[in-house]
């Protein structure tokens, strides 16, 4: 933030209620306080469903960016962030702990619409160097993620379900030989419901449409939309999240 302000950036803390246009071209945005900000270029960093459903005005609605239905959503997630001591073995910066059988996880999510009973766990150990050693200190920052159904707009996860889910996560890690000190005090940082609240229209989906099959990642909208001056970024547009597609 300090660097942005130093470079002359104006930061507005209001919500954007509408993207404005004239003759099919971007002219600005309308904020929730009624103010208009004039511009001929906008970078939208969010779920592209929000554009068609909420932000694009009627004048350019015929130039749809893209859309997807409730039945055609990608994965959501449950995540934890913590700063704890670990033991058992040295983590890498990126770590994946697979469940067994792996296919059951996606059956739980896409066919049954529920949190996997035995989820695969991803851990980003942010303070680890490439050789696995800690940058400094004994505690380290950890980001844990498991896949979940994108049903945040119509389903709620109970406290009992969350306790069961968290227990299965740390049970898998322990089974794999990783001990995390005092995991009971770890708060849940994000759920499908919270992702949905942050990105209305997504239902909590993180990647837009589902990417089933090797060609499906290429069906995402590109960064340049059909609307002159409107550009897209984020996990729902090409190349999507992570390194594999960005590398290609």
Regions of interest found by a model, annotated:
Residues 15-135:
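Mid-domain catalytic core of redox enzymes
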Residues 120-122, 179-238:
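A glycine-rich dinucleotide-binding beta-alpha-beta segment and adjacent secondary-structure elements
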Residues 85-195:
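C-terminal segments that line or cap access tunnels to active or ligand-binding sites in enzymes
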Residues 1:
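Conserved redox-cofactor binding core of oxidoreductases
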């Amino acid at each position: 933030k300090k660097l942005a302000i130093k470079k002359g950036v104006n930061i507005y803390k209001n919500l954007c209620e509408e993207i404005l246009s004239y003759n099919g071209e971007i002219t600005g945005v309308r904020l929730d306080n009624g103010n208009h900000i004039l511009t001929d270029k906008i970078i939208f960093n969010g779920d592209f469903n929000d554009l068609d459903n909420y932000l694009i005005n009627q004048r350019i609605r015929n130039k749809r960016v893209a859309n997807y239905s409730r039945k055609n959503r990608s994965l959501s997630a449950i995540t934890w962030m913590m700063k704890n001591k670990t033991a058992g073995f040295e983590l890498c910066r990126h770590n994946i702990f697979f469940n067994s059988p792996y296919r059951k996880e996606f059956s739980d999510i896409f066919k049954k619409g529920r949190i996997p009973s035995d989820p695969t766990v991803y851990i980003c150990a942010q303070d680890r160097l490439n050789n696995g050693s800690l940058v400094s200190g004994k505690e380290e920052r950890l980001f844990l993620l498991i896949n979940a159904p994108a049903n945040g707009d119509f389903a709620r996860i109970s406290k009992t379900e969350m306790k069961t889910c968290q227990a299965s996560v740390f049970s898998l890690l322990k089974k794999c030989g990783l001990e995390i000190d005092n995991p009971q005090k770890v708060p849940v940082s994000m759920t499908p419901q919270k992702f949905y609240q942050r990105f209305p229209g997504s239902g909590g989906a993180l990647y837009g449409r589902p990417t089933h099959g090797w060609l499906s990642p290429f069906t995402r909208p590109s960064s340049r939309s059909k609307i002159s001056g409107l550009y897209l970024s984020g996990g729902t547009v090409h190349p999507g999240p992570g390194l594999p597609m960005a590398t290609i």
